[in-house]
């Protein structure tokens, strides 16, 4: 299938899924969740949904479990909003790139402040 179409379908699902998670999902386990990326398979049967979840490790696991439990509801809502013959099955994956970037940024800040202290000495 055309890679451009697959990419557009992924972006559309990402946009609509973000809206549904903000406004429509009432599961208390699902906390502050951000959809960072959606990778759709070439046959449009499977969509890997990468999410960033704010909170402790325990809260992240609970939110991921809540999202997996709400998969049917989310597919139904996306089906109403996105015109596709078949809505892909969602697989939710935790996106740790934001946490990784934050760790790198804090390390760089620490190195910078150490360098400034050495310059002052």
Curated annotation (Swiss-Prot):
Keyword Cytoplasm (UniProt): yes
Localization of this protein: Cytoplasm
PROSITE patterns in alphabetical order: RBFA
Key words, A-Z: Cytoplasm, Ribosome biogenesis
Molecular function as annotated in GO: ribosomal small subunit binding
A GO cellular component annotation in the UniProt record: cytosol
One Pfam family from the record: RBFA
Gene Ontology BP annotations: maturation of SSU-rRNA
HAMAP family: RbfA
Family in the record: Belongs to the RbfA family.
Functional note: One of several proteins that assist in the late maturation steps of the functional core of the 30S ribosomal subunit. Associates with free 30S ribosomal subunits (but not with 30S subunits that are part of 70S ribosomes or polysomes). Required for efficient processing of 16S rRNA. May interact with the 5'-terminal helix region of 16S rRNA.
Subunit structure: Monomer. Binds 30S ribosomal subunits, but not 50S ribosomal subunits or 70S ribosomes.
The name this protein goes by in its record: Ribosome-binding factor A
